[in-house]
Curated annotation (Swiss-Prot):
One of its GO terms (biological process) is thiamine diphosphate biosynthetic process. This is Thiamine-monophosphate kinase. It comes from the Bacteria. Optimum pH is about 8.0. GO terms for molecular function: ATP binding; magnesium ion binding; metal ion binding; thiamine-phosphate kinase activity. It comes from Escherichia coli (strain K12). Belongs to the thiamine-monophosphate kinase family. The gene is thiL. Keywords: ATP-binding, Kinase, Magnesium, Metal-binding, Nucleotide-binding, Thiamine biosynthesis, Transferase. Reaction mechanism of ThiL seems to utilize a direct, inline transfer of the gamma-phosphate of ATP to TMP rather than a phosphorylated enzyme intermediate.
Length: 325
């Protein structure tokens, strides 16, 4: 049976979450009507994902829905925000009901996990792409930003950057991993990244700055450096690698992927010396490793990478949509 735009929305995307009392009116009218809780600041982020650019054209729709939402959740995590609402503008080449069912089921599984509600959006015909607008709340005056780092702050990352780039390389047959368990782990790190929502919330009163690693550590830490007007010194020997990555990738390639591979969606953040003990307590029970990799400083500009005690020059760069190939 043919499925028009409005029946498509009703069948696959109009799923009300009654637990969200801040939504007066969701899908079905010209606008959503929403209430911002008292003493909360609204945090908003938007991402566009295009087939062949941000994801492989033959990706499983369940993985696509998960990743599309997860990367937006990662932006909220970087600000220390609580997830609340989502808008979705979806462009489809045709109506494939099996594809839509898999996509929407996966999307709502993750929405429900974070007690979020889809409040509106749009559908149209064209090459496969989507734009998501995510909304969350952060207590007034407690949001994490890129601009708060101070000289002397210690620089940390969660998880093990570089895994996502390795997973993509496996999917593109650029990396051969014979161990099925390791291959599955790395592919999952690319297709289904874990937004560090709890870590971001725990950092509200501990970190001076934070950012999520979407374009690679070089690029993203560079944003903190620029916004905070101070330098950063990184000890390459301190960068954490997963066992799966270390077993199948040469050290220099692992380092390159960790610094410039992108799409890890871990958090990079800076913490003053005074808060390091509290940081261990706040993040230590959340089940995700976090590693100190360097220090912010006033005596250099930009990023300085140290190997065996000496500065080294790296010509790697993070991902840039408009960079000249």
């Amino acid at each position: 049976m043919a499925c028009g735009e409005f029946s498509l929305i009703a069948r696959y995307f109009d799923r009300v979450r009654s637990s969200r009392l801040d939504v007066e009116l969701g899908i079905g009218d010209d606008c959503a009507l929403l209430n911002i809780p008292e003493k909360q600041t609204l945090a908003i982020s938007t991402d566009t994902l295009v087939a062949g650019n941000h994801f492989l054209p033959d990706i499983d729709p369940a993985d696509l829905a998960y990743k599309a939402l997860a990367v937006n959740l990662s932006d909220l995590a970087a600000m220390g925000a609580d997830p609340a609402w989502l808008t979705l503008a979806l462009t489809l080449p045709d109506v494939d009901e099996a594809w839509l069912e898999s996509f929407s089921d996966s999307l709502f599984d993750l929405l429900n996990y974070y007690d979020m509600q889809l409040i509106g959006g749009d559908t149209t015909r064209g090459p496969l792409s989507m734009t998501l607008g995510i909304h969350g709340f952060v207590p007034m005056g407690r949001a994490l930003t890129r601009s708060g780092a101070k000289p002397g702050d210690w620089i940390y990352v969660t998880g093990t950057p570089g895994d996502s780039a390795a997973g993509l390389a496996i999917l593109q047959n650029r990396l051969q991993v014979a161990d099925a368990k390791d291959a599955d782990y790395l592919i999952k790190r690319h297709l289904r990244p874990s937004p560090r929502i709890l870590q971001g919330q725990a950092l509200r009163d501990l970190a001076n700055s934070a950012i999520d690693l979407s374009d690679g550590l070089i690029s993203d830490l560079g944003h903190i450096v620029k916004a905070s007007d101070c330098g950063a010194r990184i000890d390459l020997a301190l960068l954490p690698f997963s066992d799966a990555l270390s077993r199948h990738v040469e050290p220099e390639q692992a380092l390159r992927w960790a610094l410039s591979g992108g799409e890890d969606y871990e958090l990079c953040f800076t913490v003053p010396e005074l808060n390091r003990g509290a940081l261990d307590v706040a993040l230590g029970h959340l089940g995700v490793p976090f590693t100190c990799i360097g220090q912010m400083t006033a005596d250099i500009e930009g990023l300085c990478f140290i190997r065996d005690g000496e500065p080294v020059t790296l010509d790697w760069k993070g991902y840039d949509h408009f960079a000249t190939p």
